[in-house]
């Protein structure tokens, strides 16, 4: 598909700016059940033994608390706790790896928390453990999330020596007052030095995370952040919408409601961000992601072969995803499975059973069909009926008659073009892709649970 500019229609954005899922999975994690057990997981593992493997390892520790954070994390300065955690991870890895014998790992990602909480010896220990138990492709993507306050240049050298070739750095905002109010003060010069050094030593892909909607942010202050980010020139950018949920995330209670930008200011910041980044040469991938036109995500989207999973957008859609560590989520075969979310329960279950499986879901045929539909729309901004009809032996207009009725008002508003061959998301619809996907979500129709999701913008 051709690269489209976003058509910013404020009236439509305000009309459709209600809560909805982010669709890193379908069904979403709200449908996970503790009835899903180890036997169902083992059956899913055996279903597609030829699939390559993507690994995710969750490192929950942080030295400091960022007030905006909604991630599963443990704030501590006691480094020995990471050793205890690695002991449990070793048990889980040694127990899980034989199930995937013969499969090749094409992708590894360390997320958190703060993965660079680990010191050099701990980093090496974990990488050695993974390489000894899994078979990595020579060209595997090996990525890590980095907090610029928690790393030195020599640690970056160490990561590169251990095989890491991709880097994602949380910057959030360059404004000093904003940083102070969210307890995340950082050295701007060092961020530039870090990214430049990463490129010099052979990291092939760099990503910067920003957040809009933080306290004391204004369109003017965020414009400064965007200008500095453009000078950093990362391959990819993620610009997340801050969801203020202090009743759910205790740390957010330290943020004063009065300091937050108004809903209109947030929309102004988003509009400014999209305009600035697209004018700076970035392609809008969708949701909150941007990439350079020559980046593989941008290329894959233009070719209609982009995919999405719990780690975000990816070019590797034919892989099974195995998540390890506390709260980690796996996508194996036609199932989703999540590990214990609390560290105490994680330790106890790994010690007793060798795994930490807490809950999950085995997808029905209908789930799989709808997953394919939603993935095509959210990743590639279009859906061709023919491949769905062929793969699942159905007639699209009949099978999705109710869904197409729900989509009709969105088509009338110009968010999508619908004909007998498929659905094309328009320039107006790109920002509201979650709303478009929601038309095909039967779980939303069955239960009035939309308040449990973040707003789409």
Swiss-Prot record:
GO terms for biological process: protoporphyrinogen IX biosynthetic process; protoporphyrinogen IX biosynthetic process from glutamate. [4Fe-4S] cluster binds at residues 62, 66, 69. Changing residue 56 to F: Decreases activity by 50%. S-adenosyl-L-methionine 1 binds at residues 56, 112, 145, 329. It comes from the Bacteria. S-adenosyl-L-methionine 2 binds at residues 68-70, 113-114, 172, 184, 209, 243. Its main location: cytoplasm. It is an enzyme of class 1 (oxidoreductase). Inhibited by EDTA. Pathway: Porphyrin-containing compound metabolism; protoporphyrin-IX biosynthesis; protoporphyrinogen-IX from coproporphyrinogen-III (AdoMet route): step 1/1. Residues 47-280 form the Radical SAM core domain. It catalyses: coproporphyrinogen III + 2 S-adenosyl-L-methionine = protoporphyrinogen IX + 2 5'-deoxyadenosine + 2 L-methionine + 2 CO2. It is found in: Cytoplasm. Changing residue 145 to A/I: Loss of activity. Iron content reduced by about 80%. Its EC number is 1.3.98.3. GO terms for molecular function: 4 iron, 4 sulfur cluster binding; coproporphyrinogen dehydrogenase activity; coproporphyrinogen oxidase activity; metal ion binding. Binds 1 [4Fe-4S] cluster. The cluster is coordinated with 3 cysteines and an exchangeable S-adenosyl-L-methionine. It holds the Pfam family HemN_C. Keywords: 4Fe-4S, Cytoplasm, Iron, Iron-sulfur, Metal-binding, Oxidoreductase, Porphyrin biosynthesis, S-adenosyl-L-methionine. The keyword Thylakoid does not apply. GO terms for cellular component: cytoplasm. Monomer. Belongs to the anaerobic coproporphyrinogen-III oxidase family. NCBIfam families: hemN. Involved in the heme biosynthesis. Catalyzes the anaerobic oxidative decarboxylation of propionate groups of rings A and B of coproporphyrinogen III to yield the vinyl groups in protoporphyrinogen IX. It can use NAD or NADP, but NAD is preferred. This is Oxygen-independent coproporphyrinogen III oxidase.
């Amino acid at each position: 598909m051709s690269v489209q500019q976003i058509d910013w229609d404020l009236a439509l954005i305000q009309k459709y700016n209600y809560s909805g899922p982010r669709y890193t999975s379908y069904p979403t994690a709200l449908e996970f059940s503790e009835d899903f057990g180890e036997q169902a997981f083992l059956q899913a593992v055996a279903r597609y033994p030829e699939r390559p493997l993507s690994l995710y390892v969750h490192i929950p520790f942080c030295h400091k608390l960022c007030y905006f954070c909604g991630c599963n994390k443990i704030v501590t300065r006691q480094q020995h706790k990471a050793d205890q955690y690695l002991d449990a991870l070793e048990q889980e890895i040694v127990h899980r790896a034989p199930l995937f014998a013969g499969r090749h790992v094409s992708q590894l990602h360390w997320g958190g928390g703060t993965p660079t909480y680990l010191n050099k010896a701990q980093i090496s220990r974990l990488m050695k453990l993974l390489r000894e138990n899994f078979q990595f492709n020579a060209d595997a993507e090996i990525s890590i999330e980095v907090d610029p306050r928690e790393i030195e240049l020599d640690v970056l050298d160490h990561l590169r020596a251990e095989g890491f070739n991709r880097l994602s750095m949380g910057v959030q905002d360059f404004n000093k007052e904003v940083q102070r109010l969210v307890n995340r003060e950082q050295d701007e010069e060092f961020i530039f030095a870090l990214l430049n050094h990463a490129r010099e030593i052979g990291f092939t892909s760099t990503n910067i995370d920003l957040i809009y909607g933080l306290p004391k942010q204004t369109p003017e202050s965020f414009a400064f952040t965007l200008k500095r980010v453009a000078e950093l020139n990362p391959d990819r950018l993620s610009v997340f919408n801050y969801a203020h949920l202090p009743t759910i995330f205790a740390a957010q209670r330290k943020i004063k409601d009065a300091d937050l930008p108004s809903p209109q200011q947030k929309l102004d910041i988003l509009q400014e961000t999209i305009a600035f980044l697209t004018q700076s040469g970035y392609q809008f991938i969708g949701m909150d992601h941007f990439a350079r036109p020559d980046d593989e995500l941008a290329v894959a989207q233009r070719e209609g072969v982009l995919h999405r999973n719990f780690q975000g957008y990816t070019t590797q859609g034919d892989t099974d995803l195995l998540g390890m560590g506390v709260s980690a989520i796996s996508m194996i075969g036609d199932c989703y499975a999540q590990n214990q979310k609390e560290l105490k329960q994680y330790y106890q279950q790994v010690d007793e059973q060798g795994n930490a499986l807490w809950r999950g879901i085995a997808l029905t045929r209908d789930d799989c069909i709808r997953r394919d539909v939603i993935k095509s729309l959210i990743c590639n901004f279009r859906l061709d009926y023919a491949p769905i009809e062929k793969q699942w032996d159905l007639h699209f207009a009949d099978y999705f008659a109710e869904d197409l009725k729900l989509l009709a008002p969105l088509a009338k508003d110009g968010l999508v073009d619908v004909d007998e061959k498929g659905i094309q998301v328009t320039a107006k619809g790109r920002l509201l892709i979650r709303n478009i996907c929601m038309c095909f979500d039967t779980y939303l129709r069955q239960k009035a649970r939309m308040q449990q999701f973040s707003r789409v913008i």
